[in-house]
């Protein structure tokens, strides 16, 4: 019974999800239905948390909109998500960046992660 559930979950998982970590700036394009119209809405911000649970994986994105902090939790493999684009890689040392909720302005900035190349 468990193998059947795992197989069905594996089929429903998206394969085109880019690799991103907490601290990265991402743009998530989501399908929004307004009346009879269906359109794409972009949500761009910093990933502050990732929850890895297979098909039930989720991530939280935080942005500042009109001086107010807005957080949105996305299900990674949801059909509502059209695309996820990594805009900037952030250098952080923690898995959950909830401390950004209390910070504003320059103290809420995250350093950019530099890719190390092997010169041997």
Swiss-Prot record:
User: Which molecular-function annotation in GO is an example for this chain?
Assistant: structural constituent of ribosome
Read off the SUPFAM superfamilies from this record.
Translation proteins SH3-like domain
Q: Name one Pfam family in it.
A: Ribosomal_L19
Top-level taxon of the source organism:
Bacteria
Cellular component (GO) terms are:
cytosolic large ribosomal subunit
Q: Which PROSITE patterns match?
A: RIBOSOMAL_L19
What UniProt keywords apply to this chain's record, in alphabetical order? Ribonucleoprotein, Ribosomal protein
Question: Which biological process annotations from GO are given for this protein?
Answer: translation
Q: Which HAMAP family match?
A: Ribosomal_bL19
Q: Which PANTHER family match?
A: LARGE RIBOSOMAL SUBUNIT PROTEIN BL19M, RIBOSOMAL PROTEIN L19
What's the family?
Belongs to the bacterial ribosomal protein bL19 family.
Describe its function. Answer: This protein is located at the 30S-50S ribosomal subunit interface and may play a role in the structure and function of the aminoacyl-tRNA binding site.
Protein name in UniProt:
Large ribosomal subunit protein bL19
């Amino acid at each position: 019974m468990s193998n059947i559930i795992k197989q069905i979950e594996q089929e429903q998982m998206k394969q085109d999800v880019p690799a991103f970590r907490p601290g990265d700036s991402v743009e998530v394009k989501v399908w929004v239905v307004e009346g009879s119209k269906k359109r794409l809405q972009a949500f761009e911000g910093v990933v502050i948390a990732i929850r890895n649970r297979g098909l039930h994986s989720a991530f939280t994105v935080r942005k500042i909109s009109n001086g107010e902090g807005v957080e949105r939790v996305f299900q990674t493999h949801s059909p509502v998500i059209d695309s996820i684009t990594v805009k900037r890689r952030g250098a952080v040392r923690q898995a959950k960046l909830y401390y950004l909720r209390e910070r504003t302005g320059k103290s809420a900035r995250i350093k950019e992660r530099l890719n190390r190349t092997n010169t041997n």
